[in-house]
Amino acid sequence: MKKITLFFIVISAFTGCKKWLEVQPSDLIVDTELFSNATGFRNSLNGIYIQAARKDLYGKNLSWGLNTAYGQEYMIGKMGAEQALAQDFNKDHASSKLIIDGIWSVAFNNITNCNKLLKEIEGLGEDKFIEGRSERNMIIGEATAMRALMHFELLRLYAPSPAEDVNGKFIPYVNSYPAKFNPPVATSQVIEQIISDLEKAQGLVAENDTLKNRDALAGGLPTMLSGLGYTLPGGSFFTFRMHRLNYVAIHALLARAYLYAGNFAKAKEEARYVYENFGPHGKRPWWKFTEEANTTGANRYTKLANDILFASYDADLLVSLTANFISTYRLSPDVDQWFPVADRDYRAGYISEVQTDIIIQKGKVTEKWNESRSSTAEAKSQNTISPVIRLSEVYYIYSEALFKDGQVNDALTVLNQVRNARGKLTTFNQTGEEAFYQELLTEYRREFLTEGQTFFAYKRLRKNLMRGTQVIPMDSRFTLPIPQQEQIF
């Protein structure tokens, strides 16, 4: 892989609501200065999170941009730069190349930053950190988890699903700094490395998130999302855990990775752990599903944030959405099939018809990305986040793994828990495999609309997509090519 420029974003202050994330990038800093103390490592880790929120990644393409367009969630001709790639499947179009190159380069740049941090922290003892061992381990754990997550996103886009080709060599796994020669390795090896990194990461963040600083998660939505109500002596760096790769989020990502790999037993184990311990049906209900009362009115929760385990933060997200999403992107007419009028579902209340006399702007949109002008901090804080993984996905993973294990009734119970939490009054009770997967995939569409996750369920299962009555086979069109400049290893 060609040399990637190291770019660290520096954060100046750690006091006040989200000050650790709101500061803009500054000049590059000499390594010896940046990594001379614990504050430098905090700065570099914050920069890694900010880079993950860029429009090439979770700020657009890995959420409401390419991934959503690939899932055929937008109307034909009513999307932006993704149209050539996701509608026409033209990977050679100039706009397609910008997307393909952008995701790859920014993701690997972030991986490089993770590896640089991990190399430098080896030389700084735990006594140099304000919160000692737990802080040092937490920083190592989060950087390791981000490295795994970036590789996982690249694998899902730039390689066929493991169900199609697990032995093919498509992307490298880069876990050292500097990285000068990194040939692609088999998908099975990439998955092994991803899982290894996530397993290591969850152990490293465990002390901070479940013992020393547990109230930053147990404190509920205001603390996790808005940083309110709880602060360690170390400062607000230890709050906002929804914006961080926390202990529970990492377990959820492990469940997602195992499921994508086709390892249902391990996916079930990880999902069950989260389900039985941290959700509304668990021993410590630190997360819950947004109550219907919070889905309407001036203080509505636009992103249904109560069950988000990890979300990227971008202070300029609304600016990007206003410039692109609101005036251009319109939902597929198929959305009416996903939310039939006769089947009550409060998620349908987030879909509206654009009121305009301009014909080309007519169509339906999701209000998920609308600006909240609420006076409550936890509602307004949702303006700047892009969900990366939710508790509901853990429920879906657990349900599917139970179904594959022959525990059909238990699988339906778990699936219906999400459906009912979202306002449905009906119970899904069909036990056949085809019917189960049809309902599961429809739930993905309802739950993750424009969040960029639905497409990967179809790719993982090798299920064809639909565009109205048109069948779109799940084939090589949905695997991005490695950028030309990266093909010399």
Residues of each region from the PLM?
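Inward-facing hydrophobic residues that define packing positions of alpha-helical scaffold repeats
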Residues: L45, I111-C114, I191, L198, ...
